[in-house]
Design a protein with these regions (language model features):
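Short beta-strand elements at the ligand-binding edges of bilobed clamshell
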Residues: 33-67, 88-92, 226-241, 356-358
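Hydrophobic alpha-helical
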Residues: 1-21, 105, 125-222, 343
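Hydrophobic alpha-helical segments within soluble ligand-binding/sensing domains
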Residues: 48-81, 100, 167-171, 216-220, ...
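Beta-alpha junction/loop-to-helix N-cap segments that form part of ligand/metal-binding clefts
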Residues: 1-40, 48-52, 193-200, 360-371
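Exported/periplasmic ABC-transporter solute-binding proteins
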Residues: 183-190, 201-273, 285
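Extracytoplasmic ligand-binding site segments that recognize negatively charged/polar headgroups
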Residues: 53-62, 80-167, 326-338
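Hinge/cleft segment of the Venus flytrap/periplasmic-binding protein
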Residues: 83-84, 89-90, 97, 109, ...
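Extracytoplasmic "Venus flytrap"
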Residues: 1, 90-99, 187-193, 321-349, ...
Length: 371
């Protein structure tokens, strides 16, 4: 499977197999079953993964949408047919985060169907009549009124070159869906804000249809003031810090949780309410926060370092180290507009000299050929 990796390189003759390795954003796993790649996660004694709690975030996104429906029950059903219809932009059918978010939405809205490996996360194509086997019609009760909920359409947003999570494909999809489904579309849902904003800008804002995404990208957070329904912050500020902090600690040979669970000399430390560590999976997970009209002003700058870990390390005790870091899909909106800018701010604070390599989201050779 394709994964985003960051490898640290020191001067000297340390073999690559012994250098610290931190996977981030995309957890090494089987793209079909979602099973973790334990071999990749145990490459050596200084190998870790940094991401976010995908299931907790998926549940939050689903709950956010269900709560919105209940709060706007008098206006949400645009054509008054008693069916709350939604369309869903799926980022990557083989990506664990995409799978979790699709499942979270379907679970919260009652449209989920259980399969042999849990809730079915496959796209339905079009499902105007409710006959698709991948989902079922759900129900939501609001003050004595029962609404049916139907997934009218969903597809993986993969472009002709094979890149997934593609905003352009999502924009084309919403145009096609709007043409065939019209005012039966009451809600637009996306696995991320990149696709969500593409659909919001091309159709749903003009038509007053609430759109929900994921990632709390700056443009999506700002768009909440203009009718974007909401998004989920995966605490990218915490993730980016963890990604580089683990490398810093491994390179320095100090306790791996220095500046994480325990304060470093500069006072950097994370509290347990923003992350946790799963030892069996060798994975650090940031916790998610729902961003809605009630709190979006607190999230307007998605590239601001997290306050409790924004203290500069002393260069005399933490001298400059060199790191090779690749981003598997540099065209991805979240990775390019939020994650990398955060990394670039933390690399200065942590005295790391980083060589950033952007991949095309399709072939590993696009990155490894530049090693």
């Amino acid at each position: 499977t394709s994964a985003a990796t960051s490898t640290a390189a020191e001067s000297g003759t340390v073999e690559n197999k012994d250098k610290p390795l931190v996977w981030f954003n995309r957890q090494p796993s089987n793209s079909t079953t979602g099973e973790l790649d334990t071999e990749a996660l145990n490459f050596n004694g200084n190998t870790y993964y940094v991401g976010f709690d995908a299931n907790q975030g998926a549940e939050l996104q689903g709950k956010m949408i269900a709560d919105y429906i209940k709060a706007h029950a008098d206006t949400i059903d645009r054509n008054g047919d008693g069916v709350i219809g939604y369309v869903l932009a799926i980022g990557d059918i083989g990506h664990n985060d995409s799978i979790a978010r699709t499942r979270g939405v379907r679970s919260a809205l009652g449209t989920a169907v259980e399969g042999s490996s849990g809730i079915v996360s496959d796209p339905v194509g079009t499902n105007a009549d409710g006959s698709a086997t991948q989902v079922q019609d759900g129900t939501i009760d609001v003050d004595g009124t029962t609404f049916s909920v139907r997934e009218l359409a969903s597809q993986e947003m993969k472009n002709s070159a094979g890149a997934t999570w593609d905003a352009g494909t999502a924009s084309n999809a919403i145009s096609a869906w709007a043409s065939s489904l019209g005012d039966s579309i009451d809600i637009v849902i996306s696995n991320n804000d990149g696709m969500g904003m593409a659909m919001f800008n091309s159709w749903s804002q003009e038509n007053g249809v609430p759109t929900f995404g994921y990632d709390a990208n700056a443009d999506a957070v700002a768009a909440i003031a203009d009718g974007y329904g909401g998004t989920i912050s995966q605490h990218a500020d915490v993730q980016a810090y963890l990604t580089l902090r683990l490398l810093r600690n491994a390179l320095d040979g100090v306790d791996i949780n220095t500046g994480i669970a325990t304060p470093d000399a500069a006072g950097n430390v994370l509290s347990s309410d923003v992350y946790y560590y799963n030892e069996d999976e060798r994975s650090y997970y940031a916790l998610n926060v729902a961003v809605t009209a009630d709190n979006y002003t607190d999230f307007t700058d998605s590239t601001k370092p997290y306050g409790p870990v924004s203290n500069q390390l002393d260069a005399t005790t933490s001298p400059e180290k060199s790191v090779w870091l690749d981003i598997y899909n540099s065209a991805d909106n979240f990775l390019s507009a939020t994650y990398q800018p955060l990394l670039e701010k933390y690399d200065d604070l942590l005295n790391l000299k980083i060589d950033y390599i952007g991949g095309d989201g399709q072939t590993e050779a696009n990155i490894t050929n530049r090693l």
